[in-house]
From Swiss-Prot:
Phosphoserine: residues bearing it: 286
Extracellular side: 23-255
Annotated positions for site Cleavage: 243-244
InterPro entries, per the entry: Neurexin-like, Syndecan, Syndecan/Neurexin_dom, Syndecan_CS
Protein's membrane topology: Single-pass type I membrane protein
Name of the protein: Syndecan-1
Pfam family, one: Syndecan
Record keywords, A-Z: Glycoprotein, Heparan sulfate, Membrane, Phosphoprotein, Proteoglycan, Secreted, Signal, Transmembrane, Transmembrane helix
Protein's cellular compartments: Membrane; Secreted; Secreted, Extracellular exosome
Sites where a glycan is attached: 37, 43, 45, 47, 207, 217
Organism: Mus musculus (Mouse)
Quaternary structure (record): Interacts with CDCP1. Interacts (via C-terminus) with TIAM1 (via PDZ domain). Interacts with MDK.
Post-translational modification: Shedding is enhanced by a number of factors such as heparanase, thrombin or EGF. Also by stress and wound healing. PMA-mediated shedding is inhibited by TIMP3.
Amino acid sequence: MRRAALWLWLCALALRLQPALPQIVAVNVPPEDQDGSGDDSDNFSGSGTGALPDTLSRQTPSTWKDVWLLTATPTAPEPTSSNTETAFTSVLPAGEKPEEGEPVLHVEAEPGFTARDKEKEVTTRPRETVQLPITQRASTVRVTTAQAAVTSHPHGGMQPGLHETSAPTAPGQPDHQPPRVEGGGTSVIKEVVEDGTANQLPAGEGSGEQDFTFETSGENTAVAAVEPGLRNQPPVDEGATGASQSLLDRKEVLGGVIAGGLVGLIFAVCLVAFMLYRMKKKDEGSYSLEEPKQANGGAYQKPTKQEEFYA
């Protein structure tokens, strides 16, 4: 009895999983026009009552199932050994809990390895950051023809109890050496250059030239020492003058310009001379209106009277 009830329950479950879909078949469907000659539709009866209604029929699928298809064969559990077992564990850092809605990472542990060992292999060493002390030095340079005053004072953000000393560096030492720090109070160093002397840098400072001075202050400003003789001269556009001078300096270009001018002058003189010649010939020429008559068999005879027309 119990076995029969089990079979009935399995049959009902199988029928519920496969819903019966009604199959709709159109009976009154006109055949397809293969030759394409039929222009009128065949859906009308021709009696004037309108289109014929379509007749639809539904076919329900059969509900009989073979019983022998639903037999279930029990299977024995597969033997498992302790060596081939795999443990699935979720690895989370200490003090953290998985939130709702977030996927949990499952790590498959192999024999002889743990999830912690894999984490150690993945993690990289943190980069070491070294903070270097940066001291800013503010300086003002005044360029004059007579004297130059250089004032160096400590920055407002420097530590109290320290003072800054400036000393010329050697040629082999870099330009941006840190200032020497000594104990004691703050002090201000002022240097005044005598009249008539130029503002020169010690050997090794700057960019290697004596005309430019590069200060290593916080703003990275560059101050150029201007010579007194070149201060009042207007700026010269080197791009415009350089192109014209380069063309005129070449002998081939200069010779071509001179030759072209001479040829043009000769051609103009010849044209004017030809025009004057034509005008002069028209003024001097004379043309007779009647031809002289020849007598005595065509012998030459001086005409007695001849009318002349002056053009």
